[in-house]
Amino acid sequence: MRASGIILHITSLPSPHGVGTLGREAREFADFLRRAGQKYWQILPLGPTGYGDSPYQTDSAFAGNPYLIDLEQLITDGLLTREEVDAVSFGSDPAQTDYGALYAGRFDLLRRACERGWDKERENVDAFYRENESWLRSYALYTAAKRHFGMRPWIEWEDEDLRLRRSEEVLRRYEELLAEDIRFCIFTQYLFFRQWHAL
């Protein structure tokens, strides 16, 4: 049986927040494809990107890209305010993505959402963590450690015990030291997958 579809990364959808997200625009596009008789939407990888922001150069095969979290939904959920979101510049040219502005603005807003939502969503976040602990524990520690070591590649991190040996004692020490950033990573993954599954 023959079928047709389209290839379009979610970031290519229109958005006032720098890149397309898992929000209303994605739902409307999926509805449009259905009405147009299309059976497939190839979305390309959705993992968190690093330097260069290519969806094919990701830090994890399992994690979702925080850029794709819909800020409008976070306003609806009471985790952000309209004023906070509107105060952030995601770049001056709507035809091009300014990844520097996107990174700075988006992560500041997501940190605010985490501060407000961690206790409110704690039971759901804990359940999400338990279901995904096989990859999420390591990924959250990695992202927090990368930030701790100035966003340098892991092979340049000063602590050889963390880079090479990764004993449970060393991991626990860093989990305690970097608890706030680890919590932020876990919360953003929770938000991403909640929105992804809703789509």
Regions found by a protein language model. Give the residues of each.
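Acidic/aromatic-lined carbohydrate-recognition and catalytic surfaces
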Residues: 1-199
